[in-house]
Amino acid sequence: MVNRFSRRQALQAVTAGTVALSHTGPAAAEQPAAAEQGEGACVLMAEATEGPFYLDPKLERSDITEGRPGAPLNLALTIIESGPCTPIASARVDVWHCDADGLYSGYAGQGAKDTSTKGQTFLRGTQTTGSDGRVTFETIYPGWYPGRTPHIHVKILLDQKTLVTAQMYFPELLSRRIYGERDPYTTRGDAPDTTNSNDGIFKASGGESGGVMLAIAGVGDVLTGSLVIAIDRSRTSAQGGWMQWLRGKIGPN
């Protein structure tokens, strides 16, 4: 018998493992309305540029922190088929994001100090969905860098085919509170210059109605970000990376 997610069950999948948490600390006041997450649970996730910092180190692991400092964040993602709302098993889920200083692992020439992280693999990892379509990651709340609102990249593959490349986002007020109250974000000496409301990639993904907003719950110092990601297994991702996206904006070099 095929297991199908109703809208109610899809919503429950979003909040699985978080509903029992007492909402204290910075996440409490910023949790998105559950009904909003549930209504869009079976709607295709909007794609977004892969960005310039994707790597495929084939790191099959749930804890991707590698000791990087920051506010603890657990990711709970559920991958489902958009039409019937059925969980997708054996899908590979890649996630990657910057650290509290806005740096990605594995690349040179980053930031105002031209920092190199080549040879490092922090804040990257891969998990494979089980029969329930779920994966979890232990990470930290991402920092910021010029021109972008805080986000986490995600890529989903099935049978060696990339089905979707996207980015996941946070409630704006929560980011402000984390960055204003928690180390090491408070010691950076600069401030974010971009929010959800003026981030072009966020808006191009449909904004808060694009199925890209993480539902946040928390207890104490630990946050949990949950999202049901609906995909169409018959499609192939149209996002081939940062340069492909850039050429689409400015034309051939």
Predicted region positions:
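Alpha-helical and His/Cys-centered functional microenvironments
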Residues: 13-16, 27, 155
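N-terminal secretory signal peptides and thylakoid transit peptides that target proteins
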Residues: 1-18
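Glycine-rich, charged/polar anion/phosphate-binding loops
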Residues: 154, 212-213
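Beta-strand-dominated extracellular/periplasmic modules and repeats
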Residues: 35-207, 230-252
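Extracellular beta-sheet/turn segments enriched in Thr/Pro/Gly and aliphatic residues
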Residues: 63-66, 213-217, 222-233
